[in-house]
């Protein structure tokens, strides 16, 4: 099993690489790429950790050597948010970065499972899909926008609010991966009830949690460590699915035939072909149905931006 991380010298990439080095199955290969010259050194640093995961780093303009034979590609390359920016402000820089990297993925490892972390995810996933369509290698079951950070934040904040063991909290987060498009389905959380006020404040906190971190870091970065953990969880789930493990379910932003939008985050069953099945997200409350319906124009606009960028 070979996993490639593109953008591996950045804050998310280094955290993700560390977690993968310690958690990938024995015998796996971990390939790190970044434009930054430090990247081979990051791999050397991580290579001193005593796990049976072989690691190699690549720097420079061309990610191709890092991508050869990759089963899973996780893309975190791009610029991070600063105070006062929202995820869409990143579009102008990150759109081109994702397009260029996906062109190389399409040419080098077209059947790999690809997880996009680079923001704005609502748009960058659409860009990736269009690039792969142009290259004639698009498989909607192999492309994912990683929204796991919204899920782990929801789990954490619910457990804190209700004094629960966080390991017991399961929640679906649907929609997209920015602001109002992030919709945690709190009505489905088992064994707990929320007041209307709690639902409203918790939903808003989950939607704005990225900004909470950006502001707390006072210009020194965005959510890199928690995103690294979220991306590792999702990446390991992709690997487990590829290895034939049963019942691996994660929420992800996918081209899953949703009635709501061309791309939509919802639970998916993972397997040897990536998405084995897009799962229904279940019954929702009136609050959630309203929030879902009112986000769709924003989400569709984000998607159109990505499609138009490639065309």
UniProtKB/Swiss-Prot annotation:
Pfam families: Ldh_1_C, Ldh_1_N. One of its GO terms (cellular component) is cytoplasm. It is an enzyme of class 1 (oxidoreductase). The active site is at residue 177. GO terms for biological process: malate metabolic process; tricarboxylic acid cycle. Its EC number is 1.1.1.37. Transmembrane segments: none annotated. Substrate binds at residues 81, 87, 119, 153. SUPFAM superfamilies: LDH C-terminal domain-like, NAD(P)-binding Rossmann-fold domains. Keywords: NAD, Oxidoreductase, Tricarboxylic acid cycle. PROSITE patterns: MDH (PS00068). InterPro entries: L-lactate/malate_DH, Lactate/malate_DH_C, Lactate/malate_DH_N, Lactate_DH/Glyco_Ohase_4_C, Malate_DH_AS, Malate_DH_type1, Malate_DH_type1_bac, NAD(P)-bd_dom_sf. NAD(+) binds at residues 7-13, 34, 94, 117-119, 227. One of its GO terms (molecular function) is L-malate dehydrogenase (NAD+) activity. It catalyses: (S)-malate + NAD(+) = oxaloacetate + NADH + H(+). Catalyzes the reversible oxidation of malate to oxaloacetate. Homodimer. Belongs to the LDH/MDH superfamily. MDH type 1 family. This is Malate dehydrogenase.
């Amino acid at each position: 099993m070979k996993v490639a991380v593109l953008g591996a010298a950045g804050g998310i990439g280094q955290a993700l690489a560390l977690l993968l080095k310690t958690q990938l199955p024995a015998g796996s290969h971990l390939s790190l790429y970044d434009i930054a010259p430090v990247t081979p050194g990051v791999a050397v640093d991580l290579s001193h950790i005593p796990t049976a995961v072989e690691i190699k780093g690549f720097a420079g303009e061309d990610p191709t050597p890092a991508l050869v034979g990759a089963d899973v590609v996780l893309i975190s390359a791009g610029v991070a948010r600063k105070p006062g920016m929202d995820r869409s402000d990143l579009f102008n820089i990150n759109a081109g970065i994702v397009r260029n990297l996906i062109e190389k993925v399409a040419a080098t490892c077209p059947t790999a499972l690809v997880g996009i972390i680079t923001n704005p995810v609502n748009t960058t996933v659409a860009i990736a899909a269009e690039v792969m369509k142009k290259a004639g290698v698009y498989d909607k079951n192999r492309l994912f926008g990683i929204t796991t950070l919204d899920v782990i934040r929801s789990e954490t904040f619910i457990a804190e609010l209700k004094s629960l063991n966080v390991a017991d909290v399961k929640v679906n987060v649907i929609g997209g991966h920015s602001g109002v498009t992030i919709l945690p389905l709190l009505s489905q959380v088992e064994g707990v009830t929320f007041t209307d006020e709690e639902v409203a404040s918790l939903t808003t906190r989950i939607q704005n949690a990225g900004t909470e971190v950006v502001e707390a870091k006072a210009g020194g970065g965005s959510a890199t460590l928690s995103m690294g953990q979220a991306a590792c969880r999702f990446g390991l789930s992709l690997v487990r699915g590829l290895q034939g493990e049963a019942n691996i379910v994660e929420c992800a932003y996918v081209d899953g035939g949703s009635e709501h939008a061309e791309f939509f985050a919802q639970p998916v069953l993972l397997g040897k072909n990536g998405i084995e099945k897009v799962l229904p997200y279940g019954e929702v409350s009136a609050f959630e149905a309203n929030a879902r319906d009112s986000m769709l124009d924003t989400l569709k606009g984000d998607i159109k931006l990505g499609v138009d960028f490639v065309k």
